[in-house]
Amino acid sequence: MNQAIVNIDPKAPAPDPAWMILSDEGVTVTLSIASELNGVKQDKIHLRSPCVREVRACQAAHPNDEQAVDAMLFASLAGVSEKDVLNLKVKDYNRVHKSYFRLVEEDDL
């Protein structure tokens, strides 16, 4: 019997899912269901990497509503309306949410 021995490093980051394409400049998320973004049905949404000023502006606009902060920020980073973000299916909104946090987190810490 020939079995491969797999050495899994528990500190290694999990691989990105197939629906997420990550770079230093942003993240592209493949939607499970095409959604209307800026009046056009699309199956992908791209979020560019944010700057601190943008995050703070969204937090100032919605100081007591974390979900509204996220929706405003995701819309700004994707260049779409908040309505477009809020009309995503929950599964796709969760993909965008996870992808955003994967984009802004530091891997090596």
Would you name each region that the model predicts?
Residues 2-109:
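Short, surface-exposed, charged amphipathic helix/loop patches that serve as local interaction elements
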